[in-house]
Each structure stands twice: as structure tokens, then as C-alpha cells.
Amino acid sequence: DFDSLFKAMSKISKNELVDVCVGFDPYLQNIRMQRESLSSDLKNLAGVIKGNKNRVSAMKDTVKIALSGRRYMDNVEYSVHLILEEKTQESATTSIVEVKRICNHAGGSEIESSIPKILRANPFTPLNNIIGPRGERWMPIHVIIPHSKANQAMREIQQLLAKHQDKLDKNKIGVGFLYTVISNNGFVIEPVFFTPDSIDEIHKEVVEDGILKNIECFEDNPVARGLTNTLRYELFDLFEDIGGVHMQIGKSYNFRKGLNIESWNVIENIKHTVDPNGLI
């Protein structure tokens, strides 16, 4: 469950044991497994080989990933995927042992490390993830909170969504979660909406043709879109109530509401100084 996942991720983060720490809930995990094609898998495997200077080790990794395919995730619910870097093999081994101990203590069990190896070998992949596997509109939001508040925040998010579950089901809107950490002091929860709605020109421009030709072309769906937007803004309010912050000033989030009056006055004074005529 997410309590066990968060426990492990926070412990690993607070001890600064890894460079990348990413978790998925069951829904988003399933989406991730659906999304990629065989040709994409082969490209990723090629990246694993190219990204490893030790050809023997690279071939071993590639064979393990190919043999495990996607079956290794079949019975997995919540998962965490980790990448760590150290100056020596000895220190790396020590960190790996400690990471495994923390995960085992939280009730986890080890799976094939395909996702970290592929992420490491292919850091700049095409932006095909900006639509769902069937062509759904992808709408993520996020909140950053202290580690100590992560579990309670997740429970409150789930409670809010549960109140609207009938409407979500009726409109075939899926909600998944991505989790990550920021150094040893921040925990990121990212709810991701997959809405059966039309996509924009930017999606058609950015997503690869091989992906676009295999998706459904959803018609404009203002009801589903409206429900998604309503829930997003309800979640924004919840994030502010629990003391969360975000990384996207000027976008959907209410920057002003998250500041006390003194901080807002500082911002206004700076704005007046650099833009006295209000041109920006």
C-alpha cells in the first residue's frame, strides 16, 4: 500500500542514498505497461547497451530485461524505482544493501530493475507520455509537502476523489499517481488524470506518428473535461489547506493564496520597481 511505499521512499530520501526515487500507484503502473510498443522496447534495449561502457555487463542487463519483459510487474501493486551513483563500487554496494534493507523492512520485495536501467540509458525520450495509451488527454498536477505530511495528504486526496468516483467511472476518467522526492526534505505527489477528450495540435505535433496512428480519436467531451477541471481545482484548494507548494508559478496554481501578506507585499514591491507601468 502507499503507506509502506511512502515509508520506504522517505527513509531512503532522508538518508540521501539515491539520486532518483520514483514510485507508481497500481493505475499509473498499468498505464505505463500498456503505453510502450515492441519497437519502443527494442529502442530502449539498444539504449541500455550503448549507455554501459562494460559491454559484457550491458549484454547481461539487456538479456535480463528482455527475458523479464513486462511480466515482472504483473502481480505488483505499488512500486518504487531507484537510481544511485557513488564514487566507488564499494560505496555503491553499501548503499544498495541499505536501500534493500529499508525496502524489505517496509514490506517490499525486489523486482527486476528494468525501469531504472532503461531510464538511465534513455534520459531524453520522445514526449509520447503527454497522451494516454488510448489517446486520452493527460492532465497532471502536483503538490510538494514535507515527508511528515505525505501519508495524511495522500489519504485526504483519496477521500476527495472517492466522493466523485461515480462521476469518474461514468465519464471513464482514470486517475493515477506518481510519487517522487526532493532531496531529504520534500515529497512530491502527482495525481494524473486520463480523460477521454479530444487532443490539441500540440499533441499531434509532439507525439510520434507511430503512436498517433494507433490511438483512438476522441471527440470533444466537455462534460468529462469539465469534471476533470473541477477536480483539479478542488485538489489545488486541498493542497493549499495542507500547506503544500508547487513548481509552476503562473500556471494553474494560485500563487497569491499560498503566500502571507508580508511575502506578497515583497513581490508587489519588486514588480512595481522593475515594471512600474505594468507592461508585463
Predicted feature locations:
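C-terminal substrate-binding/cap subdomain adjacent to the FAD-binding core in PCMH-type
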Residues: 1-123
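Conserved glycine-rich FAD pyrophosphate-binding loop
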Residues: 68, 72-75, 98-280
